[in-house]
Amino acid sequence: MSIDFSNFAYYKNEDMETNMTIRHSKTSDLPRLMEIFDVARSFMAETGNPKQWVDGYPSEEVIMEDIGNGDSYVVEKDDKVVATFVLREGDDPTYDIIYNGEWLNSEPYATIHRIATSGETKGIMHTVMQFAKQRHDNIRIDTHEDNKVMRHLIMKEDFKYCGVIRCWSGAERLAYQFSKHK
């Protein structure tokens, strides 16, 4: 089944047994998004990644900026928000310089940031990646070296490890890229 996402605000993944939907985040979603980020921070700490998303990151201000820019999305199952992520089109300045490797290509790309789940539903990463891949030929994503769960999920979705980038705080992140035109 081929779906055109060129003019979307809503996406229903009918291929997944879990029957999830994706839509733009709204300001009214903020309390639930903050709960989800709390759960994600706890999960990361419990699975050996206590250094990512510290000191209250992402803050309400960051999330509100993402919502205002139209980059923030939620994943719903049975009308309940179970995950969130940012899908941003265009160049990301933190990806301008890559160390110990190189990007697969220099074509236009989208970036996925701040993917987080409530832990209530499986298949979130696959649903998010299918959504992004339907819209973009090149997608970049990064994560902390200690985030072994995310690293595994990223590779499972046909991303290639490209090298190391430095995020706005100066912290190093492992960087990956998916390209339909390898």
Regions found by a protein language model. Name each.
Residues R135-D146:
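Conserved GNAT acetyl-CoA-binding A-motif
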Residues V74, K80-G90:
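Conserved beta-strand in the GNAT
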Residues T117-Q134, H152-K156:
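Conserved acetyl-CoA-binding loop-helix of GNAT-fold acetyltransferases
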Residues R41-E61:
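Conserved GNAT-fold acetyl-CoA-binding loop/helix
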Residues H126, D146-G163, A171:
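Conserved active-site alpha-helix within GNAT-family acetyltransferase domains
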Residues T21-E35:
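A short beta-loop-alpha structural element at the N-terminal edge
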Residues E61-V74, D91-D92:
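A short helix-loop-beta-strand connector motif used in the catalytic cores of GNAT acetyltransferases and
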Residues V86-E120:
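Conserved acyl-donor/pantetheine-binding loop and adjacent beta-alpha core of acyl/acetyltransferases
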